[in-house]
Amino acid sequence: MKDKLVKAIAKDGQVRIIGAITTELVNEGVKLHNCAPTAAAALGRMLTAGALMGTTLKSEKDTLTLQIHGGGIAKGVVVTSYADGHVKGYIGNPTADIEPNSKGKLDVSGIIGKNGNLLVIRDMGLKEPYIGQVPIYTGEIGEDLAYYYTVSEQTPSAVGLGVLVDKDLSIKSAGGFIIQMMPGADEMLADLISYRLEEIPSITEMISKGMTIEEILEYIFEDMDLNILESIVPEYRCDCSREKVERALASIGQKDLKEIYDEGKEEELKCHFCNKAYTFSHDEIGDILESYYNEK
C-alpha cells in the first residue's frame, strides 16, 4: 500500500481528522539510521506523528519539531516536519532494544522512559518559536501526544500510531491518525468515537490487510458523514546542505573553531537526520574563521 495522508471532517465539522499510511516513509528513516526493532518502532511512531502534525502548519516555510526525552536508553527522539508532509528525524540510540512488553508488543515506552517531557515546537518565522511542553504520560508516544493536545491546546484528541517491524527489520506497515473534537461538539459523539476506537483492530493490522487510509477512516466513522478534504503523499526527506552544515560549524564559536583550525586537520560533520558526512579541509576551516569572525 502506497503512503498517503488525508485530512477529513465528520459529523458536519464536529470532528477533525488527519490520517496516514506511512510505511515507506518510516522504512526510509529506519534504514537510514540502521535501527534495532524497538528503536524502529519508536522512531517510526514519531515520524508518523510528525507527518500528521506538520500538515497543520499554515506556511511552507514553517516547521514543527517534536522531541521526546524520557531518560531511557533511546536517548531521545527528534522529528522535524513541514506543511507539505515531508519529515525527517533521528533517535539518539538507534540500537536501543529490549524484550517485548507484557502484551508481546515492542516496548517503546521501555526505551523512551517516563522521566522527562514531550515538546512540540512550532517555528513560524517569528522572533521566538512557540513551544508547548508536557510531562511524558506513558512513553508510548501516541498517548503522550493525546495528553499534550488535551492539556496544552485544550483540544480533546485521540492519537493512534502504529509501526509493525518485520523479521528482516524492514517495516511491514506503519500509519496513524489524529482525531479531534471541535469546540461545541456533541459529548455523546465523543463517547461513541472513543468506543469505536477501542473496538477496532490496530492501524497496522488494517494496513497489513490492504486497507487504504480512506477505507480505514470510513470504517471508524461509518454513518458519520466522513468528508475527505485533501490528500498528499508524505515522505522522508532531509534538506541538509553543505551551507547549512558550514553555518552549524561556525556556530560552535570563535574559540572552539580556532582550536580546530590550529590542529591543522580536516573536520568531518554528519547530519543527524540522514547521516550524510560533510568534510571541511584545514583551509576551508580557515576560510570559515575569516568569513564569520575576521580571523585566521
UniProtKB/Swiss-Prot annotation:
Q: GO molecular function terms here? A: protein folding chaperone; unfolded protein binding
Q: Name one GO biological process term.
A: protein refolding
UniProt xrefs under InterPro entries:
Heat_shock_Hsp33, Heat_shock_Hsp33_C, Heat_shock_Hsp33_N
Q: Does the keyword Lipid biosynthesis apply?
A: no
* Disulfide feature: C238-C240, C271-C274
- Pfam hit, one: HSP33
Q: Where in the cell is it found?
A: Cytoplasm
Q: Which UniProt keywords apply?
A: Chaperone, Cytoplasm, Disulfide bond, Redox-active center, Zinc
Q: Which domain of life is it from?
A: Bacteria
The record's GO CC annotations read: cytoplasm
Q: How is it modified after translation?
A: Under oxidizing conditions two disulfide bonds are formed involving the reactive cysteines. Under reducing conditions zinc is bound to the reactive cysteines and the protein is inactive.
Main subcellular location of this protein, as a coarse class: cytoplasm
Which family is this sequence assigned to? Belongs to the HSP33 family.
**UniProt cross-references to NCBIfam families, sorted A to Z:** PRK00114.1 (NF001033)
Stored PANTHER family: 33 KDA CHAPERONIN
What HAMAP family does the record tag this protein with? Answer: HslO
Function statement: Redox regulated molecular chaperone. Protects both thermally unfolding and oxidatively damaged proteins from irreversible aggregation. Plays an important role in the bacterial defense system toward oxidative stress.
Q: What is this protein called?
A: 33 kDa chaperonin
- What species is given as this protein's source? Clostridium botulinum (strain 657 / Type Ba4)
